[in-house]
C-alpha cells in the first residue's frame, strides 16, 4: 500500500507541476502570482527528483546479485 501511495504522490506532484507550467506559460498571472507559482514548481520538481532517485536506488538494490550490480535495461511492461 505504501508503494501505491508513493506512486500516487509522485503522479500528483507531476500533475500539479504540469498545471503550474501551463499557468506560467499562459502569461495571465501577475508577477507576484508568477513568482509564487515558480516557487511551488521548484518544490514540486525537487520532490519528483527525490522520488525518482529513491526509485532508482531501489531498482539497483533489487538488481544487486552476489555483491555485484547487474546492469539490466528497465522494462516497464515486465511483471514483477
Curated annotation (Swiss-Prot):
It catalyses: Exonucleolytic cleavage in either 5'- to 3'- or 3'- to 5'-direction to yield nucleoside 5'-phosphates. One of its GO terms (molecular function) is exodeoxyribonuclease VII activity. Keywords: Cytoplasm, Exonuclease, Hydrolase, Nuclease. It is found in: Cytoplasm. Its EC number is 3.1.11.6. The keyword Hydrolase applies. InterPro entries: Exonuc_VII_S, Exonuc_VII_ssu_sf. Belongs to the XseB family. Heterooligomer composed of large and small subunits. PANTHER family: EXODEOXYRIBONUCLEASE 7 SMALL SUBUNIT. This is Exodeoxyribonuclease 7 small subunit. It comes from Pseudomonas fluorescens (strain Pf0-1).
Amino acid at each position: 500500500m505504501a508503494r501505491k501511495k508513493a506512486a500516487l504522490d509522485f503522479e500528483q506532484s507531476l500533475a500539479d507541476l504540469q498545471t503550474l507550467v501551463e499557468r506560467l506559460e499562459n502569461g495571465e498571472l501577475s508577477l507576484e502570482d508568477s513568482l509564487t507559482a515558480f516557487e511551488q514548481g521548484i518544490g514540486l520538481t525537487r520532490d519528483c527528483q527525490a522520488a525518482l532517485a529513491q526509485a532508482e536506488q531501489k531498482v539497483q538494490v533489487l538488481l544487486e546479485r552476489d555483491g555485484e550490480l547487474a546492469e539490466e535495461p528497465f522494462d516497464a511492461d515486465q511483471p514483477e
